[in-house]
Structure formats: C-alpha cells, structure tokens
C-alpha cells in the first residue's frame, strides 16, 4: 500500500516577482485553466521569462504537471530551472536512459540481423524511477520529459500493486521479504551494494531503492516481525533517522504478477503457434523455425526469471491489452486531472507526430522475417491522436506556435514585454555581394566591445569554409555541427560565454533554447533561400538569439526580400514597437541579461537527444522541397549502410518516413 499525499501545495521560491506583461499572461492562463479551458497557447517572445510564467501557473493551479521538451538538452535546462523555483516540491526528470542505443533490426538485402544493443545511463534510470514513484506518492509533482514519455512503460497498476510496503511492528518473516524483493526484480548482492540491490546480515536486511543514489534503508527483524526501519547512508552506513513507513517500488517498470504471467505465457505460446503455422503455409520454413526457437527461449526465461531481454516486446500480453490498443506510458502514471505544458511546441508536436511511423516500419521487418511475434508491433510510442486522448488540459509554449497548435485552440496569450526592458533586435537586410568582408568588419566591432556573434549558414560546406576564412583573419571562431554531442555542445556554449572564443557558426543549432546574453550580433547568411531553415518561424527563432543583449542587432544577407523574411521582420518590428512604448511609459532603460554561467549539470552528460540530430519542422516544406530532401537523405542512408553504420542509417530512414508521412 502507498501512502499518497494529496494535500501538498507547490511553493514557488524566487527573488523576482512577475513584471512586464508576465502578470497579465499568468492571470489569463490560470483563469482559463480554472475555467476548464482544454487548450491554450503561450506565445512568448524570446527572453520574456516563459519558464517563470509556467512556474507561476503551476504554483497557482496546483496540479501535477508534465512539461515536454523536444530534446534532452532543453529538458535538462528546464529541469534545472524548475528545481530552483520549486526546491520543496518533487521536480523530476524523465528522458531516454540510453547513452547508446542500437535498435533491433533486420536488413533483408544482406540477410543481416542487428541485435538490440544499448548502454543505460544509471543516473537517468534512477531519475526515471524517481519520477514514477513520486507520481504515485504525492500530488505536488512536476515531471520534465522528452518525447520518451510517449513510449511504452508498463502498467502503472501492476507497478503500484507490486510495491512492497513495510512498517515497524508488521508481521513478515525475513525470508518472505527477500522473496518479495526478488519478485520486484531486486538483486541480492552482499558486496556491491547499489541501486536496485539488497544485502542480508543476519536479521538485518538493507535495501537500496531504484530511485535513490545515496540513501538506503535498513530493516531490522525480531523473529518474524519488523522491529524498526532506519534510513542510512549507503556508503558509510551512518543512520540518518527512523522511518514509520517504507514503500519499496519495483526495480523495473515492466511488472507482472505470477497469475498474469501464466496468462501472458499462454497467449504468447498461442500466438507463436499461429505464426509458425502461417510461415509454414507460406513455405517460409527458416522464419518458422526462427520464431519458434526465439519465442520458446523467451518463455523459458520468463518462467524461471520473470524477465527476459526484450520483455517489452511482449508487453501487450503482459498488460492484458487487445491488439492495436495503445501501450501504457508515463502519461498513465499521472492522475486524470493533470496539466501538460509543451515547450517549443512548434518542434515538439512534430516529433510526437513522427514517432509512431518510424518505429512501426522497423518492427514490421522483424515480424515478417520471424524475429518477433506480431504483438511486438504494440510495443510502440503513442500516435498523436492517442496522445491527445490523454490530454486533460494543455498549454503550448512557443515564440512561434505551429499550425497544429493554432488549429487546436483560438486562445493565444501573448507575452512580449521582457522584465529587463530589452527590445527585440533591429533587423536589417544587406546584399550578399561582399558579405564576407562586411561580416568580418561587424564581428571586429563586437569583439572590441567584448560581445559575441552568432552566424547561421545553410550548408555544412559553407559553415566550414567560413570558419576557415575567419580563422585566417585572426578571429577566434568555432563551428557547431550536428555530430557534436550534448555535453560537448553545452561546453561550447559555456566557452563562448566565457570568452574562450568570440564567434559561433552553426546551421540548425542556433535556434531554440540557446541563450547567450553576450551575443549582440546574429548574422543570417542566404536569408532569401526559402525553406525550412529560412521560413518565418525559423527566422523569428534565429532573430531571437540577439534579444538578450541591449545592443542586439540582426543582419540578413540576401539579394531579395522573401515573404518569410518580410513577415519575420514585420513581427519583430511589431514586438519592438510594443516594447519601446512600454519602456517609455514606465521609464525603463533596457539592460542586458545578467545570467550566471553555471557548471555543467550531471544530466547533460547523457548522450544527445532521443531522435536524430536533424530535427526540423517538415510541415512547412513544399512538396518539391520534401522530395528533394527525401532524395538527399536516401543517398546519406545508403552511404551509412555501406559503411555498416546501421544505427545512423536507421535514424535517417526514420526521418525519411516522417517526411513521407506528411500529407
């Protein structure tokens, strides 16, 4: 039994109070949520304090909240900020726990089976367990997640029913407790005591919960009764205090009791026989033998150990779901009345839409060639419409909301005024002829004042050439390309802020979520090349990178002004006018943001995002552009396959399928 606390309240801790148009945005969002509004958009300009507004809304509506970001880096930034705002509440982090992940796959052309291979980040696994246990124990929970939250996780009911509940005075034998711990996938290890393990010393059992990393629990027996329970330091054994109730959550999210396990095994056997019969009828004898051999091995492991590698592929039978029924996910661990906030929604909602198709095409190949039963297709991410069915109330947060969000609601709450009085930058267009010399002069002006520069190009080749040119001219410059992993990227941004170098060049990496107040100039090369990097939303996001410095300035190098450029400049000018009027009315002088340069947080040491690095709003492409992109990606996929880099090839293929899925 779990002692759930439903009366906790969120307590926001901040030295700031709402300012600019934050008070109006907070009040409107809260009133709409309390009035039962299902969906609304917070359209907040870069640097207006959207995260602070989100925190105020969470504190006032006091509902468990899921915040979804489109990659681990942004999720990590948000997690750190929410932890600071809510030190007394449960702020949790839920992203893919793989440092390295090669999905199970089969390549028919070369008859190559690629076994699933992965490396799990222990720190992130701990944080995932902490998230699910917090959701079942209390109401004041914020979970910051990536799109991993729409992947299958196991039944929350089985997970909750498997919790081992202990109290002083409870009658239970030591051996019964040991059996219970093994049933919920804890391992006995009297020497190497770490998460998900227990050790035994006479009448004393010490348990290290899967959601902790420093503190464990010591259960002392007197006969067949628990004498007392103490919290201890796992390393030193020092007693920290006595505990009146201890709930030990399972060491895995995929739990099934013995009764359900036997039912599941019967269904797996029946499905295997049907599949073998089907293959034999079609003359596919190798596939028939393969699926029987693999499935019988898994069944034996399930009977003996209660677990097998790839157990998630049998989750439909384990959970008692029907064919095609959506899997249980993190969303099912929340109570019905919870709040969802989608950060950078114009990117995140596109990811949520694209997850299902890429996963299914890979699994169908495994099923067709006898590596997996058809039920493996139901171990999958949610479709977008299934995600929508979980939504009770949702706030889309973006400076540039996408068409999908705009189609979901007419309620748009604008947040344009920055608490610092900073204005949207001035934007000017200059001819591309002679742009290198012109740009070099602008960079030198900024460097002399101790300011930094962002340059965004359209191609990798141009970025590399420009980097070489600027280095020859004596400029301290770095190029941030898509091969750079999360931790390195964070280090590069930190070095830029510290002045190790002055200019950062990128392609699609200098948009959402990169906040460097020292940057006063953003240069956009080939601004008139209409496409997914130079559409209205992309340009507004890029312009926003200069909005955290009082000297913010944007130069677009182009030979003509496209419709996207004009709309982006018009929107920036509209915001700038409103901001200037507000400053004049209230006597505010714009001040560059003073942002502490933090040490790298541990969770950013995980390896990159859940999806291929190239995350793009494909819905904005024309049909012709999509076809060209597909052709280019297919070539890259073939090259990766020839080099036996099947993981990269599979990632590129998923992007191609996402492109093809667009109507």
Curated annotation (Swiss-Prot):
ATP binds at residues 44-51. The keyword Protein transport does not apply. Residues 435-601 form the Helicase C-terminal domain. The keyword DNA repair applies. Residues 31-418 form the Helicase ATP-binding domain. InterPro entries: Helicase/UvrB_N, Helicase_ATP-bd, Helicase_C-like, P-loop_NTPase, UVR_dom, UVR_dom_sf, UvrB, UvrB_inter. Its main location: cytoplasm. It comes from the Bacteria. Keywords: ATP-binding, Cytoplasm, DNA damage, DNA excision, DNA repair, Excision nuclease, Nucleotide-binding, SOS response. GO terms for biological process: nucleotide-excision repair; SOS response. Residues 627-662 form the UVR domain. Signal peptide: none annotated. It is found in: Cytoplasm. A motif (Beta-hairpin) lies at residues 97-120. GO terms for molecular function: ATP binding; ATP hydrolysis activity; DNA binding; excinuclease ABC activity. Transmembrane segments: none annotated. Forms a heterotetramer with UvrA during the search for lesions. Interacts with UvrC in an incision complex. The beta-hairpin motif is involved in DNA binding. HAMAP family: UvrB. Belongs to the UvrB family. The UvrABC repair system catalyzes the recognition and processing of DNA lesions. A damage recognition complex composed of 2 UvrA and 2 UvrB subunits scans DNA for abnormalities. Upon binding of the UvrA(2)B(2) complex to a putative damaged site, the DNA wraps around one UvrB monomer. DNA wrap is dependent on ATP binding by UvrB and probably causes local melting of the DNA helix, facilitating insertion of UvrB beta-hairpin between the DNA strands. Then UvrB probes one DNA strand for the presence of a lesion. PANTHER family: UVRABC SYSTEM PROTEIN B. This is UvrABC system protein B.
């Amino acid at each position: 039994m779990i002692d759930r606390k439903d009366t906790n309240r969120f307590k926001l801790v901040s030295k700031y109070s709402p300012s600019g148009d934050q008070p109006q945005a907070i009040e409107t969002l809260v009133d709409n949520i309390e009035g039962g509004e299902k969906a609304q958009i917070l359209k907040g300009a870069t640097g207006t304090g959207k995260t602070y507004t989100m925190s105020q809304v969470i504190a006032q509506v006091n509902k468990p909240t899921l915040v979804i970001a489109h990659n681990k880096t942004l999720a990590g930034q948000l997690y750190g900020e929410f932890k600071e705002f809510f030190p007394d509440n449960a702020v949790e982090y839920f992203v893919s726990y793989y440092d390295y992940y090669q999905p199970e796959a089969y390549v028919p052309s070369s008859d190559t089976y690629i076994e699933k291979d992965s490396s799990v980040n222990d720190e992130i696994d701990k944080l995932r367990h902490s998230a699910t246990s917090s959701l079942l124990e209390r109401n004041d929970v914020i979970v910051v997640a990536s799109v991993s939250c729409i992947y299958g996780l196991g039944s929350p009911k089985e997970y909750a029913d498997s919790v081992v509940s202990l109290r002083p005075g409870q009658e239970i034998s030591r051996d019964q407790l040991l059996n219970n711990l093994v049933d919920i996938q804890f391992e006995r290890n009297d020497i190497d005591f770490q998460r998900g393990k227990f050790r035994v010393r006479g009448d004393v059992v010490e348990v290290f919960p899967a959601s902790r990393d420093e503190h464990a629990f010591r259960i002392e027996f007197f006969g067949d009764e628990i004498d007392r329970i103490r919290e201890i330091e796992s390393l030193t054994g020092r007693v920290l205090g006595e505990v009146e109730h201890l709930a030990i959550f399972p060491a895995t999210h995929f739990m099934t009791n013995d009764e359900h396990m036997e039912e599941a095994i019967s269904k797996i056997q029946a499905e295997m026989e049907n599949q073998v019969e089907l293959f034999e009828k079609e003359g596919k004898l190798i596939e028939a033998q393969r699926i029987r051999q693999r499935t019988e091995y898994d069944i034996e492991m399930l009977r003996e150990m209660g677990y097998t590698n790839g157990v998630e592929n049998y989750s439909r039978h384990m959970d008692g779901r029907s064919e095609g029924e959506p899997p249980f996910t993190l969303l099912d661990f929340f109570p019905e009345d919870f709040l969802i906030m989608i950060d950078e929604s114009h990117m995140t909602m596109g990811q949520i839409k694209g997850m299902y198709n890429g996963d299914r095409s890979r699994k169908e190949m495994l099923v067709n060639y006898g590596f997996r039963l058809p039920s493996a297709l139901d171990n999958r991410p949610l479709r977008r419409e299934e995600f929508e069915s979980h939504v009770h109330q949702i706030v889309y947060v973006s400076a540039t909301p996408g068409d999908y969000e705009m189609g979901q609601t007419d309620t748009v709450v604008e947040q344009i005024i920055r608490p610092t009085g900073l204005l949207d930058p001035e934007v000017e267009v200059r001819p591309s002829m002679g742009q290198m010399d012109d740009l070099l002069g602008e960079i030198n002006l900024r460097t002399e004042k101790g300011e930094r520069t962002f340059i965004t190009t359209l191609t990798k080749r141009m970025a590399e050439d420009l980097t070489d040119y600027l280095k020859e001219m004596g400029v301290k410059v770095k190029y941030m390309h898509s091969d750079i992993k999360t931790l390195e990227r964070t280090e590069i941004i930190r070095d830029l802020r510290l002045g190790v170098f002055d200019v950062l060049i990128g392609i699609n990496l200098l948009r959402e979520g990169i906040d460097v107040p020292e940057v006063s100039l953003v240069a956009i090369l080939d601004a008139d090349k209409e496409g997914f990097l130079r559409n209205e939303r992309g340009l507004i996001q890029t312009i926003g990178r200069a909005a955290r410095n009082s000297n913010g300035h944007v130069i677009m190098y182009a030979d003509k002004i496209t419709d996207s450029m004009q709309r982006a400049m018009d929107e920036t000018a509209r915001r700038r006018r409103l901001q200037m009027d507000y400053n004049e009315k209230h006597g505010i002088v714009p001040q560059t943001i003073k942002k502490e340069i933090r040490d790298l947080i541990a969770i950013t040491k995980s390896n990159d995002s859940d999806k291929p690095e190239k995350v793009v709003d494909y819905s904005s492409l024309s049909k012709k552009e999509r076809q060209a992109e597909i052709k280019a990606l297919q070539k890259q996929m073939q090259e990766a396959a020839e080099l036996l880099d099947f993981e990269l090839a599979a990632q590129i293929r998923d992007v191609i399928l996402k492109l093809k899925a667009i109507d």
